[in-house]
Amino acid sequence: MASCGEVNLTVDSLTSGKKVSGEAVPEGSGSPSSPSLPVPECPICLQSCVHPVRLPCRHIFCFLCVKGASWHSKRCALCRREVPEDFLERPTLLSPEELKASATGGCGTGSSGHAWYYEGRNGWWQYDERTSRELEDAFSKGKKSAEMLIAGFLYVADLENMVQYRRNEHGRRRRMKRDVVDIPKKGVAGLRLDPDPNSSAGAVPAPAVVDVSVDGAAAERESSADGADTGVSGGRPQGTFVPAPIRPPTILGGHLTSPASSSDIQLVQTLAQLNISPNEQEPEEEDAEDEDDSAAPDASGYDSESGTSDDDEQVEDEDENEHTDGSQGKHRLQQLNRPPPGGGPANSGDRSGCPDGQCTVTKV
């Protein structure tokens, strides 16, 4: 297990060669047994780093280990400092030459010059060196399947059908193959061979159009632990604009403001043929109002001159109303036969001089 000093190695200590595995090494005194720089250990998988990357907090991990940990939390596994959102697309590799060497067959390939690939979107990805060695060893021993731990997920490689899938999810399968090293490929273990030139320090950021494409690629690769991008693009959903419903015109006061329809015109014509007009009801309403006004009994208990004049006016009104319709005459006779509003019995002889029967005559 790595000690505390080995876990917190920085780039300066690696490049200068002053501290390796807790031992001081003088500068310029290269060891004949280890001509290259030692590979740091990953605090997550506790193994030698495969394609080591350096976070902004200067902690070093495997690229796939950082990718697997970022699905649970966008923070460093040691100091809990936030990791940039675009770090997986523009990682800071400690040795970019190692990535190119593994892609060209310099390391991670067997003596036969073959490498292992898994299917991606519009191309093939090469497995990392550690996984390639495990697959080559199982294939040389004639095994039918092999298990691989990639970014915290356990995968099963079916060497007979040449497919891989997660052990707890058999439905999602991806093709794999064993081929020569120098075939066209997209990259190694999710790391592209042609990285974005804007990823270098101090470069001008790319325009918004490039950022949208990068976000789409990141969403595609989130569906797999090994950096494949065969999943359906998980772009941000765009809301559909729904226009507001148009309210119907409000009828103020219950009267239609639109022109009369054909049904209204037909109704008016039918009423005209029957000699019925809405204006014919106005005299009847006026007579009813006059009757209500004259229905109040005199407080003095006897007829006055004003009462006699009222009777004369009512008689004249009755003569004028004789020219109205027969139905109105019957209605008028029914009003004349009503008892007086006083409630007392009225004599028929007393009502003979009063056309409406509402004005009583007191005998002395």
Curated annotation (Swiss-Prot):
Cross-referenced Pfam families: WWE
Reaction catalyzed: S-ubiquitinyl-[E2 ubiquitin-conjugating enzyme]-L-cysteine + [acceptor protein]-L-lysine = [E2 ubiquitin-conjugating enzyme]-L-cysteine + N(6)-ubiquitinyl-[acceptor protein]-L-lysine
Role description: E3 ubiquitin-protein ligase that specifically binds poly-ADP-ribosylated proteins and mediates their ubiquitination and subsequent degradation. May regulate many important biological processes, such as cell survival and DNA damage response. Acts as an activator of the Wnt signaling pathway by mediating the ubiquitination of poly-ADP-ribosylated proteins. Neuroprotective protein. Protects against cell death induced by DNA damaging agents and rescues cells from G1 arrest. Promotes cell survival after gamma-irradiation. Facilitates DNA repair.
EC code(s) of this entry: 2.3.2.27
InterPro entries, per the entry: RING-HC_RNF146, RNF146, WWE-dom_subgr, WWE_dom, WWE_dom_sf, Znf_RING, Znf_RING/FYVE/PHD, Znf_RING_CS
Localisation per UniProt entry: Cytoplasm, Cytosol; Nucleus
PROSITE patterns linked to this entry: WWE, ZF_RING_1, ZF_RING_2
Residue segments, region Disordered: 18-37, 217-262, 279-364
Zinc finger feature spans (RING-type): 42-80
SMART domains: RING, WWE
SUPFAM superfamilies registered for this protein in UniProt: RING/U-box, WWE domain
Keyword Zinc: yes
Lineage start: Eukaryota, Metazoa, Chordata, Craniata, Vertebrata
Bias type Low complexity, positions: 22-34
CDD domains: RING-HC_RNF146
Cellular component aspect of the GO annotation: cytoplasm; cytosol; nucleus
Domain notes: The WWE domain mediates non-covalent poly(ADP-ribose)-binding.
Keywords: Cytoplasm, Metal-binding, Nucleus, Transferase, Ubl conjugation pathway, Wnt signaling pathway, Zinc, Zinc-finger
Pathway note: Protein modification; protein ubiquitination
Binding site for a glycoprotein: Y118, R121, W125, Y155, Q164, R174, K186
Biological process, per Gene Ontology: positive regulation of canonical Wnt signaling pathway; protein autoubiquitination; protein K48-linked ubiquitination; ubiquitin-dependent protein catabolic process; Wnt signaling pathway
GO molecular function, one term: zinc ion binding
TM annotation in the entry: none
Extent of Acidic residues compositional bias: 281-295, 308-322
Species per Swiss-Prot/TrEMBL record: Danio rerio
Keyword Cytoplasm: yes
Protein name: E3 ubiquitin-protein ligase rnf146
Domain WWE: 102-178
